[in-house]
């Protein structure tokens, strides 16, 4: 089943308080094919997030939890001031936050 933008955003919105408490996620949204309503059956969900205390251990657990609640594969990208300019521009143009 192809990921649907409205469903993904609703799930993320409902999960935000838990993600903040467990992982320190301060902002979360989607970008890419799902945000553009252009996803296919094989599409993963590109998730952009900001986190108060980022570390690899926390990000691995966040990814696993998001895949569990969304029932699909996710790619996580932490938004920050210093990042790949092309990717940053894509996120700024396509990003839909909850």
What spans do the regions from the language model cover?
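Short beta-strand->loop micro-motif that forms the acidic, two-metal-ion catalytic signature
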Residues: 46-49
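Conserved histidines in hydrophobic membrane contexts and catalytic metal-binding motifs
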Residues: 30
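Catalytic core of pol beta-like nucleotidyltransferases
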Residues: 1-27, 35-41, 51-98
């Amino acid at each position: 089943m192809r990921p649907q933008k409205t469903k993904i955003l609703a799930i993320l919105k409902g999960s935000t308080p838990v993600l903040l408490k467990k992982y320190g996620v301060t902002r979360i949204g989607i970008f890419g094919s799902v945000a553009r309503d252009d996803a296919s059956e094989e599409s993963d969900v590109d998730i952009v997030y900001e986190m108060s205390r980022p570390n690899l251990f926390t990000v691995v657990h966040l990814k696993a939890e998001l895949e569990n609640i969304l029932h699909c594969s996710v790619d996580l990208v932490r938004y920050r001031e210093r990042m790949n300019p092309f990717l940053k521009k894509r996120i700024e143009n396509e990003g839909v936050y909850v």
